[in-house]
């Protein structure tokens, strides 16, 4: 019997620079010959690296990846601020950063590590009354997005270069979803009084998916293929709860099971390796959060 979700799953794309996340989706729709393609976590055109894309029923799973952690390698230039907080904007402030010493930089980096309040860039993809902030800015509106809590668990300076009054920092950042790396660059420059902006960004991880999983977009256009099946995606993303085939049938119909003392969301997997659903204990029920294989398929 054919598996109804055999063509569903995730593609971990190594996004090239100069392309929007939606551009990637459009190209993969053609490559996979389906409209059911979507992505989790927007990458700016200048950024490269991990972009997780759902195919067919995998698109419905993407909502359960939104709150995951992410990791980036980036380059921050100290000595100038721009309108967009990255290299593509116009310079609005500059100052000589050559006098900064390592201790000053370390102190400022430390102040932006941990649980912090961060104000997203005005040209972000955040929606304000149904319209993205960057679209409002492009239309001439003044956009002010309130600061919100984010977590920066790792903010390490890997290398430092000094030239022409600028200090370029190669950094590695691990952070919660919703953290803007160019906002970190802006805030680091502000803390040091010299301005700062992002000049390079590469996303290396989205939750459990890394650059090792990523396939260059050009390769996918020549040979469209999943990085992970829907079964593999659920089992990779969440702790596995082994269930019987009968329990799997019940979950596929949206029924609940008896509680097992679980904490958090688990992937319910049958002995044959089929990931049936994401489940979570709610009161006296083990209920479905997302059904990967509904019996209606």
UniProtKB/Swiss-Prot annotation:
Keywords: Isomerase, tRNA processing. Its EC number is 5.4.99.25. Gene3D superfamilies: Pseudouridine synthase, PUA domain. GO terms for molecular function: RNA binding; tRNA pseudouridine(55) synthase activity. GO terms for biological process: mRNA pseudouridine synthesis; tRNA pseudouridine synthesis. Disulfide bonds: none annotated. The keyword tRNA processing applies. It catalyses: uridine(55) in tRNA = pseudouridine(55) in tRNA. Pfam families: TruB_C, TruB_C_2, TruB_N. The active site is at 44 (nucleophile). InterPro entries: PsdUridine_synth_cat_dom_sf, PsdUridine_synth_N, PUA-like_sf, PUA_sf, tRNA_psdUridine_synth_fam2_C, tRNA_psdUridine_synth_TruB, TruB_C. Belongs to the pseudouridine synthase TruB family. Type 1 subfamily. Responsible for synthesis of pseudouridine from uracil-55 in the psi GC loop of transfer RNAs. This is tRNA pseudouridine synthase B.
């Amino acid at each position: 019997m054919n598996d109804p979700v055999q063509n569903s799953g995730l593609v971990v794309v190594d996004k090239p620079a100069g392309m929007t996340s939606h551009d990637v989706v459009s190209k993969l729709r053609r490559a996979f010959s389906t409209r059911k393609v979507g992505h989790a976590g927007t990458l700016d055109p200048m950024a490269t690296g991990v972009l997780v894309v759902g195919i067919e029923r995998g698109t419905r799973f993407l909502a359960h990846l939104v709150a995951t952690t992410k990791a980036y390698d980036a380059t921050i230039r100290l000595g100038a601020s721009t309108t967009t907080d990255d290299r593509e904007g116009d310079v609005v402030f500059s100052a000589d950063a050559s006098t900064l010493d390592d201790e000053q930089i370390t102190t400022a980096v430390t102040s932006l590590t941990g649980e912090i309040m961060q104000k997203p860039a005005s040209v972000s993809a955040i929606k304000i009354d149904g319209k993205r902030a960057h679209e409002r800015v492009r239309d001439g509106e003044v956009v002010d997005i309130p600061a919100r809590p984010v977590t920066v668990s790792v903010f390490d300076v890997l290398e430092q270069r000094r030239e022409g009054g600028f200090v370029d920092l190669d950094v590695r950042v691990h952070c919660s979803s919703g953290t803007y790396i160019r906002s970190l660059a802006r805030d680091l420059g502000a803390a040091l009084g010299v301005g700062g902006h992002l000049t390079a960004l590469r996303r290396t991880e989205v939750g459990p998916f890394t650059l090792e999983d990523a396939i260059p977009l050009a390769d996918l256009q020549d040979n469209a293929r999943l990085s992970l099946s829907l079964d593999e995606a659920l089992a990779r993303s969440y702790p596995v709860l082994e269930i019987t085939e009968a329990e799997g049938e019940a979950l596929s119909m949206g029924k609940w099971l008896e509680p097992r003392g679980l904490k958090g969301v688990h992937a319910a997997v049958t002995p044959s390796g089929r990931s049936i659903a994401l489940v979570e204990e709610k009161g006296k029920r083990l209920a479905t959060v997302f059904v990967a294989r509904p019996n209606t398929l």
